[in-house]
């Protein structure tokens, strides 16, 4: 009889522990959802909710080989659109800007944490071998390019970087409160490093610094800033024309 009571007690305790674990999981998931909802990053611009996640997750062993002591934060991995000069379009229309982005190339920036610093993996899809490249590449190099075409690969590993872009955006969530989408773009005239663009359903509203130095932003008086590191789309557009020719 004592044994039976003891067993029932064990079962009851296990059930309690299961319930507690379930509650912790539910609150963690709910907390993550609220955390993600605080900034308007679309599912297609977050790695773990994108169509690229399955393939890129297979690179984890390679990442750990390059940075064995790193804690990789896939939850904060974001898409950066490249080869898309939004400034040259000379428009603030959200539909026109997003249409240009949809046809642009992009990379994924995956942050990681070391003991005392941050780092980033840049993951890009291999491009087809171009005819003009054949004259400057060896046969072996040409074969390597062909083998990587269409496949995701780590193209850069950087240490001692700025904090994760996601964290920077989270710090600027009040400035993004009127925006319905924020995207990261690179190689803009006067803003070569990645920068964030906040848009509402109708128009582009703000540019947000991601911790780099941008010649365009350095020319804007502090009195015209929305807040530190946040600039109106118009104020950047007014002086960015001088950088368009240099970017071509």
Question: What kind of region is each of these model predictions?
Answer:
Residues 1-12:
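Short, Lys/Arg-enriched N-terminal segments with co-localized hydrophobic residues
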Residues 20-30:
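Bacterial N-terminal signal peptides
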Residues 30-40:
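Sec-dependent signal peptide cleavage junction
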Residues 38-93:
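Terminal domain-start segments
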Residues 70-127, 187, 192-202:
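Exposed beta-strand-loop-beta-strand "reactive/processing" segments of non-cytosolic proteins
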Residues 119-189, 203-247:
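A short, surface-exposed interaction/processing loop segment used at functional sites
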């Amino acid at each position: 009889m004592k044994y039976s009571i003891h067993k029932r007690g064990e079962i009851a305790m296990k059930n309690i522990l299961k319930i507690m674990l379930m509650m912790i999981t539910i609150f963690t998931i709910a907390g993550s959802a609220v955390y993600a909802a605080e900034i308007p990053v679309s599912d297609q611009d977050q790695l773990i909710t994108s169509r690229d996640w399955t393939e890129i997750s297979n690179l984890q062993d390679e990442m750990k080989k390059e940075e064995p002591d790193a804690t990789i934060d896939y939850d904060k991995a974001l898409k950066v659109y490249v080869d898309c000069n939004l400034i040259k379009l000379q428009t603030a229309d959200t539909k026109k800007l997003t249409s240009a982005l949809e046809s642009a190339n992009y990379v994924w920036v995956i942050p990681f944490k070391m003991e005392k610093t941050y780092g980033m993996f840049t993951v890009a899809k291999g491009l087809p071998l171009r005819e003009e490249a054949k004259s400057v590449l060896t046969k072996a190099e040409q074969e390597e390019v062909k083998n990587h075409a269409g496949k995701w690969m780590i193209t850069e590993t950087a240490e001692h970087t700025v904090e994760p872009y996601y964290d920077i955006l989270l710090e600027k969530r009040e400035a993004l409160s009127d925006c319905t989408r924020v995207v990261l773009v690179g190689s803009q005239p006067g803003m070569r490093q990645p920068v964030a663009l906040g848009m509402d359903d109708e128009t582009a509203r703000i540019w947000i610094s991601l911790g780099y130095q941008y010649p365009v932003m350095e020319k804007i008086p502090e009195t015209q800033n929305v807040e530190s590191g946040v600039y109106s789309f118009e104020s950047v557009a007014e002086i960015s024309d001088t950088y368009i020719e240099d970017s071509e």
